[in-house]
Amino acid sequence: MLIQQLGRQDYVSVWQKMQDFTRQRGGAEDDQLWLVEHYPVYTQGQAGKAEHILNTGNIPVIQIDRGGQITYHGLGQAVIYPLLSLKAANIGIRRFVSLVEETTIALLQDYAVAAHARADAPGVYVADGRKIASLGFKVSRGCSYHGIAINVAMDLSPFLGINPCGLSGMKMAQLSEFVPEIDVDSVHKKWAELFSARWR
C-alpha cells in the first residue's frame, strides 16, 4: 500500500483526484493512503439535510458524493483517505468502517486518550461523548474513497455553524486538549502505521 503525503491542499482538487484515481485504478496493487490537511471548507454528504447547516459564514459549503451528513475540514485536522480495493480484500463496507474506527481508537490509546465508536453514529468519540473523528466513504467499482478526519490542533469554532454529521448539539473534541505538543504530521504517520498493520 502506497502512502502519499499531500500536505495542505484545497478540498475540491483532492476530491477530483480521488474520483479520477478510483475510476482508473486496478486491484490491491493500486491501494493507497492519502494524508492531507484541507483549507477551511464544509462538505455536505449525499444524505445531508439543509436543516443541519446553521451559520457557515464565509466558509464554502460543497455538496459531495460520500455518505453521511455535513462536516467541517480545516487546518490542524488530520485527514486520511484510504483508497482501497474492498473487493480484492474481500471485506464489506461495514467491516471496513469498523477497521477505520478501530485504528483511530488505537491511535488515541497510544496517546493515553480513551475513545470509542457508536453503533448509531459512525465516528470516534472521547469518554465525555464529544466527537474527535468524523468519517464518510464512497464505494465505486468495489473500491473505497473519501475517508476520516481527526481533529488534532485546530480552531473548532466552525463546527458551531453546523450540526456535525447531522447530530444536533454534538460537541467536538481535539487531540491537543489531551496532548498539548501534538501535530498533524505525527498523527498522520502513526495512523498510517497502525492501519497498514491491520490491512495486511
Swiss-Prot record:
SUPFAM superfamilies documented for this protein: Class II aaRS and biotin synthetases
Miscellaneous remark of the record: In the reaction, the free carboxyl group of octanoic acid is attached via an amide linkage to the epsilon-amino group of a specific lysine residue of lipoyl domains of lipoate-dependent enzymes.
Taxonomic source organism: Dichelobacter nodosus (strain VCS1703A)
Lineage of producing organism: Bacteria, Pseudomonadati, Pseudomonadota, Gammaproteobacteria, Cardiobacteriales
Family recorded in the similarity comment: Belongs to the LipB family.
Function: Catalyzes the transfer of endogenously produced octanoic acid from octanoyl-acyl-carrier-protein onto the lipoyl domains of lipoate-dependent enzymes. Lipoyl-ACP can also act as a substrate although octanoyl-ACP is likely to be the physiological substrate.
Enzyme Commission numbers on file: 2.3.1.181
Highest rank taxon of the organism: Bacteria
Active site: C165
Site note Lowers pKa of active site Cys, residues: K131
Pathway(s) of this molecule: Protein modification; protein lipoylation via endogenous pathway; protein N(6)-(lipoyl)lysine from octanoyl-[acyl-carrier-protein]: step 1/2
Residues in BPL/LPL catalytic domain copies: 27-200
Group of enzyme by EC: transferase
Catalytic reactions on record: octanoyl-[ACP] + L-lysyl-[protein] = N(6)-octanoyl-L-lysyl-[protein] + holo-[ACP] + H(+)
Xref: PROSITE patterns: BPL_LPL_CATALYTIC (PS51733), LIPB (PS01313)
Protein's cellular compartments: Cytoplasm
Protein name: Octanoyltransferase
Chain positions recorded as substrate binding sites: R66, G67, G68, Q69, I70, T71, Y72, H73, S134, L135, G136, G147, I148, A149
Keywords: Acyltransferase, Cytoplasm, Transferase
MF terms in GO: lipoyl(octanoyl) transferase activity
InterPro entries: aa-tRNA-synth_II/BPL/LPL, BPL_LPL_catalytic, Octanoyltransferase, Octanoyltransferase_CS
GO biological process, one term: protein modification process
Keyword field contains Electron transport: no
Keyword Transferase: yes
GO CC annotations on file: cytoplasm
